[in-house]
Regions:
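Bacterial Sec-dependent N-terminal signal peptides
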Residues: 1-21, 296-300, 311, 359-364, ...
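A domain-start/cap signature at the N-terminus of enzymes
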Residues: 17-52, 78, 135-159, 163-165, ...
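Serine-hydrolase catalytic machinery in alpha/beta-hydrolase-like enzymes
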Residues: 23, 27-37, 43, 47-133, ...
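Acidic beta-to-alpha connecting loop that harbors the catalytic carboxylate
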Residues: 59, 88, 187-190, 197, ...
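The feature captures the conserved acid-bearing segment of alpha/beta-hydrolase catalytic domains
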Residues: 156-236, 242-248
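Active-site-adjacent mobile loop/cap segments within catalytic or ligand-binding domains
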Residues: 251-269
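C-terminal outer-membrane/trafficking sorting elements
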Residues: 300-374
């Protein structure tokens, strides 16, 4: 009985501390009462806009699991961002597991839940809607890919911990703007590319980064930096790989945890980096228009339009002002060369009416840009 009393006192103390910091909120969505934990930083003011950060738990987990391994409240106070830990809804096709992406035939889609939640929060608080960020662990990270692919008009940047892209995402992803993304992946993570009965379920880390670097039109080769091995007892080291100079000056970053597993570095596994700190440092540099600080693009939008028009298009693209005979390539987001041709000086036209709708990379000599086929 004495031990029970001690446990109860401890439980209520922890619960009280938690409740004093977080606001447990509910919202009715798609006929279900959905929960989320909301943290308003001490530095919040109604007189200025604050960024918004979503932090998504892993599959079968709950908000408090993610808060335990990724408690960003101090960061939120220091940097004046509003923090949200949403709760996934039980998946009836997976024994009631709390999954962000439900299995089997389902019309459940949490992309719309987050879309509604952004609108709900922005109606209550002074939120900078150009600086809405997302990070997540495991299945929560897979959901971050979904947000970047399908809700990119509202998500400025994202970070994925312990998950590569699903094959279905790789095949269908279509962001609407240059998209900064960072991953923190262990080389021994079982999600480093998965096949089942000859079918690819998750692509590899290299394929994941290739997709985003090609989409963002970054430098082909990354800068590699070995992070100091400050904890020699954690069984792992970290290599930072940085692809720079993407469109709108966005970048792609990988923290490759050599010897690391399915973990959140700084909480478990590798202790050479603190994932929370690295996440905020990365995403906070961007808004939906790209790098927030001065970005010296090689071509302005006006200059791009003077060369390639119309863009987007359903059929004909006109290429103007070519001073030299050039090699032209059209490349899809998987890196496949769809067209290779030589074009003459002056004005040329391309007919892309037979192409599938989506985003392509047009390269002419040393110049490259995205074209959108409607």
């Amino acid at each position: 009985m004495f031990h029970l009393k001690i446990y109860l006192v401890f439980f209520f103390l922890v619960s009280s501390l938690f409740s004093q910091n977080f606001i447990n909120q509910t919202i009715l969505f798609d006929g279900n009462e959905r929960e989320y934990e909301l943290y308003i930083p001490s530095s919040y003011s109604e007189n200025s806009l604050s960024p918004l950060m979503f932090n998504f738990h892993g599959g079968s987990d709950f908000t408090y699991d993610q808060i335990q391994q990724s408690d960003m409240r101090d960061l939120a106070d220091e940097n004046n961002f509003i923090l949200v830990y949403p709760q996934a809804h039980p998946d009836p096709n997976d024994g009631g597991s709390t999954n962000w992406i439900h299995k089997g035939d389902t019309d459940h889609d949490d992309i719309y839940f987050i879309d509604v939640l952004i609108s709900e929060l922005s109606a209550q608080y002074q939120i900078d809607l150009e600086r809405v960020y997302a990070c997540g662990y495991s299945l929560g990270g897979e959901f971050v890919y979904e947000l970047l692919c399908r809700l990119s008009n509202k998500i400025a940047a994202g970070v994925v911990v312990a998950r590569t892209m699903g094959q279905y995402q790789y095949e269908t992803c279509s962001p609407q703007h240059p998209t900064p993304i960072m991953t923190i992946l262990g080389t021994e993570d079982f999600y480093e590319g998965i096949e089942y009965m000859g079918e690819v379920i998750y692509i590899s880390a290299d394929e994941t980064h290739q997709f985003w670097t090609e989409y963002n039109n970054t430098n082909y080769n990354p800068i590699e930096i070995e992070i100091s091995d400050v904890n020699t007892n954690d069984g792992s080291t970290v290599t930072k790989r940085l692809w720079e100079n993407g469109d709108a000056c966005v970048s792609v970053v990988e923290y490759r945890v050599n010897g690391g597993g399915h973990e959140w570095p700084g909480y478990n596994g590798n202790m050479d980096i603190n994932s929370d700190n690295e996440i905020w440092e990365f995403v906070s540099a961007f808004n939906v228009d790209g790098l927030i600080s001065d970005c010296n693009l090689s071509l302005t939008n006006e200059e791009q339009n003077s060369i390639i028009s119309p863009n987007p298009t359903r059929s004909i693209i006109t290429i103007n002002n070519l001073s030299d005979k050039s090699i032209l390539n059209i490349i899809d987001l998987k890196g496949n060369i769809i067209l290779e041709s030589t074009i003459e000086t002056g004005k040329s036209q391309l007919n892309i009416s037979e192409y599938s709708p989506g985003i392509y990379i047009l390269k002419i000599g040393g110049y490259s840009t995205k074209i959108i086929k409607k």
